[in-house]
Amino acid sequence: MKAPIEVSPLAWLDAVEQQRRAAGLRRSLRPRPPVATELDLASNDYLGLSQHPDVIDGGVAALRLWGAGATGSRLVTGDTELHQQFESELADYVGAASGLLFSSGYAANLGAVVGLSGRGALVVSDAYSHASLVDACRLSRARVVVTPHRDVDAVLAALADRDEERAVVITESVFSTDGALAPLRELHEVCRRHRALLIVDEAHGLGVRGGGRGLVFEAGLAGAPDVVMTTTLSKALGSQGGAVLGPAAVRAHLIDAARTFIFDTGLAPAAVGAARAALGVLRAEPWRVGAVLRHAGVLAEVCRVREVPQSAVVSVILGDPDVAVAAATACLDAGVRVGCFRPPTVPAGTSRLRLTARASLDDAELEVARRVLTDVLAGLG
């Protein structure tokens, strides 16, 4: 008998790697130093709070009091007074009846969508929904309808044509790839008429829209009995973690039903303490919200983006992924770090630079951004 040919069960990865390289879709990691040496137009630290001394002090104080880790799931040993205090404070800030913390925004989206849908339900999702919402749809066991971007009529048609008793519509408030706002009032009206729950991911709306309270608050939907919000603590609040905010019945249900809550270690106390302190800064310094949008306007003007930014995100579509990578690399070589989004994050043919404004940018930094972006984009021909 011939000896078996030794082939690694991971040999197929070589072919996948070659395909990614050929398509210009290979990704790599580039560690950042503790003290920034480049102008940051790529991070989600919209309000500049990740380095705020009060936020750092809040994290350190929680670390010293509660220890490094939560030590278990929230249902075992991972719950503290700090967790529950911050849940109440965050819910109060955005106008919700209650809140529930998760270990990340990704986990919060999985917990909310899967826990509030399930087999025998319909889930209607925007085509530009974040990967966490896409995965939540896949795990929900519900029938899923994906509608064109920000298309209220398509959502209406999906709800009107359903046989399922329960229906859930999910959307981001501010879409992470293009910075566009969801038509929340119109979506809510459609949901109300067709007895559907509206789940809104406020990851990029919290701290930026509604005076900081988010687009749900701005749309007049805060506290609505048929609206549930999810958010992250890692963007405007400069920390880490996630939350689901909405009616008290939703919180009670997810404690019993959300697997990403039940079977996951609780959020580290330091992250909670930092996020709580960041919320305090946001309340005390509302000027940061207006500064984000002003600075986004400057970046959009430099990049000749036609639409006035409605969020911290400025999207500069370049089309070809290799062109987008080259532009991002040129910016970095000139001392400016920008985001570079390629498929599958965005649709084919829409690779782009994704710039994010921060409240803490000063005039000198904006001038550097103006010079570098102008030169790089002009060099693309």
From Swiss-Prot:
Listed PANTHER family: 8-AMINO-7-OXONONANOATE SYNTHASE, CLASS II AMINOTRANSFERASE/8-AMINO-7-OXONONANOATE SYNTHASE
What intrachain disulfides are recorded? none
List where the protein spans the membrane: none
Q: Which domain of life is it from?
A: Bacteria
Protein family? Belongs to the class-II pyridoxal-phosphate-dependent aminotransferase family. BioF subfamily.
Keyword Transferase listed: yes
Q: For this UniProt record, give its keywords in alphabetical order, as a comma-separated list.
A: Acyltransferase, Biotin biosynthesis, Pyridoxal phosphate, Transferase
Protein EC: 2.3.1.47
By what name is this protein known?
Answer: 8-amino-7-oxononanoate synthase
Q: What this chain does, per the record?
A: Catalyzes the decarboxylative condensation of pimeloyl-[acyl-carrier protein] and L-alanine to produce 8-amino-7-oxononanoate (AON), [acyl-carrier protein], and carbon dioxide.
Cite the binding residues for substrate: R27, H130, T345
InterPro entries documented for this protein? Aminotrans_II_pyridoxalP_BS, Aminotransferase_I/II_large, AON_synthase_class-II, PyrdxlP-dep_Trfase, PyrdxlP-dep_Trfase_major, PyrdxlP-dep_Trfase_small
Q: What is the enzyme's class at the highest EC level?
A: transferase
What are the required cofactors?
pyridoxal 5'-phosphate
Q: Where does pyridoxal 5'-phosphate bind?
A: G105, Y106, S176, D201, E202, A203, H204, T232, L233, S234, K235
Pathway named in the protein's UniProt entry: Cofactor biosynthesis; biotin biosynthesis
